[in-house]
């Protein structure tokens, strides 16, 4: 069985919703075992609550377990064009995996969210840098998801990976089109992983 991990950080629930859609898409692939986990929260609980953070139910991952998966699909909100501090802190703990080459050749893909759309592509491509140092095979989604051609409404989604636009106050939830792109990303990456493990 090919093991696929959807690993995310979500403060307000947008990336959590996208992660579920990515996992739903990946689960369509025969031969793929899909696991959804989150990275640990680094904010003090009182500050997280005061900021309106949403309680997450997914189990917390450890950096060492990344070596157990054939493909990892990372989800992170944008922080000034980069991954969130929580995801950065988690990945900064993977030095031992890097030293041993434990992630070399594993598939990696990234999805993201932004407040207003600024930085969504940059967040994905800047995350790729860390994954490339691990020797992971980076999987963009291209334009195969037909929703990427729809310009009739505001929406996220890029050839680099699925995205959602949360709005400046976070009130906008992922649209059906954005979730469809996320499902496509999960199915596409899981399908490639199964073929490579074939």
Curated annotation (Swiss-Prot):
GO CC, alphabetical: membrane
- Sites binding substrate sit at 98
GO terms, molecular function:
flavin adenine dinucleotide binding; FMN binding; NAD binding; NADH:ubiquinone reductase (non-electrogenic) activity; NADP binding; NADPH dehydrogenase (quinone) activity
User: What does the note accompanying the cofactor annotation read?
Assistant: Binds 1 FMN per monomer.
Which of this chain's residues are annotated to bind FMN?
10-15, 78-80, 113-118, 133
Flavodoxin-like domain residues are: 4-189
Q: Where does NAD(+) bind?
A: 12
Question: Superkingdom, according to UniProt?
Answer: Bacteria
What keywords appear on the UniProt entry?
Answer: Flavoprotein, FMN, NAD, NADP, Nucleotide-binding, Oxidoreductase
Q: Which Pfam families match?
A: FMN_red (PF03358)
Q: Which reaction does it catalyse?
A: a quinone + NADH + H(+) = a quinol + NAD(+); a quinone + NADPH + H(+) = a quinol + NADP(+)
Q: What is its EC number?
A: 1.6.5.2
Report the InterPro entries cross-referenced here: Flavodoxin/NO_synth, Flavoprotein-like_sf, Flavoprotein_WrbA-like, FMN_Rdtase-like_dom, NQO
Signal peptide start and end residues: none
Cofactor(s) the protein requires to work = FMN
PROSITE patterns, per this entry?
A: FLAVODOXIN_LIKE
The family line of this record is: Belongs to the WrbA family.
Among PANTHER family, the record links this protein to: FLAVODOXIN-RELATED PROTEIN WRBA-RELATED, FLAVOPROTEIN-LIKE PROTEIN YCP4-RELATED
**Identification of the protein by name:** NAD(P)H dehydrogenase (quinone)
Which source organism? Shigella dysenteriae serotype 1 (strain Sd197)
